[in-house]
Amino acid sequence: MAGETTITVIGNLTSDPELRFTPSGSAVANFTIASTPRTFDRQSNEWKDGETLFLRASVWREAAENVAESLTKGTRVIVSGRLKSRSYETKEGEKRTVIELEVDEIGPSLRYANAKVNRTQRNNNQGAGNGGGFGNQGAGAQATQQDDPWAANSSASAGSWGNGPDSEPPF
């Protein structure tokens, strides 16, 4: 939503993401991120851990399925989203309110790991927000050389000015 404050949290997943489906069929993945600030103590010449923040998070739809398939317990992640409060009642009738992170973007941190990213084929065009990469191509669209402005031009007669060392620039 426009105007809402987003935050970014870097931390480790405390368990594998839990994937569920709503009665209407929407996927949701829930997980907890543990983020511990570290500071360097010059007197003792060592790193000191601060108090760990445990933050519950949820991600929806296709991203939820991608998270459940890709991320596991202990994975260091970078998560961006919006804080939301949610109230509920326990089995004992006590009213509780929790603060959770509604995830907009999530990915593995490459600081201490590497990853090979595989782009998924989209089944339908219900992507809300920035899902799907450059240009939000829908319904399994494949980027062709014609659609890709950065692709090398294979035909020399396409009107480009870089046709050799003696060609004149268009200006």
Swiss-Prot record:
Residues 118-171 are annotated as: Disordered. Residues 128-138 have a biased composition (Gly residues). Homotetramer. It comes from the Bacteria. NCBIfam families: PRK07772.1, ssb. Keywords: DNA-binding, Plasmid. GO terms for cellular component: nucleoid. GO terms for molecular function: single-stranded DNA binding. The lineage of its organism: Bacteria, Bacillati, Actinomycetota, Actinomycetes, Micrococcales. The keyword DNA-binding applies. Coiled coil: none annotated. HAMAP family: SSB. GO terms for biological process: DNA replication. InterPro entries: NA-bd_OB-fold, Primosome_PriB/ssb, ssDNA-bd. Residues 118-127, 139-164 have a biased composition (Low complexity). Residues 1-110 form the SSB domain. This is Single-stranded DNA-binding protein.
